[in-house]
């Protein structure tokens, strides 16, 4: 049986999930977190099959179970598209997916039910958002746009790419004229939100905000909110390099991080 003092597990293919972690820390600072960055197997969004993604994420869930997690957040849109149902069948602990959160926050913000989603190739081609929208809000019209290079560019250093503005213009020009809301459908994208917002006039929404609400609701309903007074501990585990990951995560989160490298 789960206990209040157990940890919250968050995972992503790399740095992107830190955008979700930051929102969680702001709202639930007393919780203990384990962040699993599978950057040794990055990228998830191109070149991997659904089956491969299911196996990779199953291994991560095993890691969380062994490390005493009470709830898991799939802070990766690609993994959520490929594996959320598979993981929920395999594991009994609560698992929160980011695609559902993205559809929910878009539904709350759109005035005309026309939204666009920028995401990885896998998420777009698998129609992760369109399929989930049919289940959660059938009136939503969803335009999915695959920004093939973005996650890799952000993971390795967005500002080092001279063609970033050109690519931004290319992909953002695909947003339909009648769309009034843009969903950041990859957790890496909030890291370049400022650049995205400079190029468009419609509302930009980040599913991480909805993830926080769902996490609070789930933990409250299960009586698992950590009620200790001191700030929680955050431990990072990565399957790839730490020399770029560590300073980038620290700069974004505004604090030093405790990080360990584990086999991929």
UniProtKB/Swiss-Prot annotation:
Keywords, comma-separated and alphabetical: Cell shape, Cell wall biogenesis/degradation, Isomerase, Peptidoglycan synthesis
Reactions the enzyme catalyzes: L-glutamate = D-glutamate
GO terms, molecular function: glutamate racemase activity
Top enzyme class: isomerase
Residue sites binding substrate per the record: 12-13, 44-45, 77-78, 187-188
EC code: 5.1.1.3
GO biological process terms, semicolon-separated: cell wall organization; peptidoglycan biosynthetic process; regulation of cell shape
Family that this chain belongs to: Belongs to the aspartate/glutamate racemases family.
The protein's name in its UniProt record: Glutamate racemase
Originating organism: Fusobacterium nucleatum subsp. nucleatum (strain ATCC 25586 / DSM 15643 / BCRC 10681 / CIP 101130 / JCM 8532 / KCTC 2640 / LMG 13131 / VPI 4355)
Lineage of the species this protein comes from: Bacteria, Fusobacteriati, Fusobacteriota, Fusobacteriia, Fusobacteriales
Gene from which this protein is expressed: murI
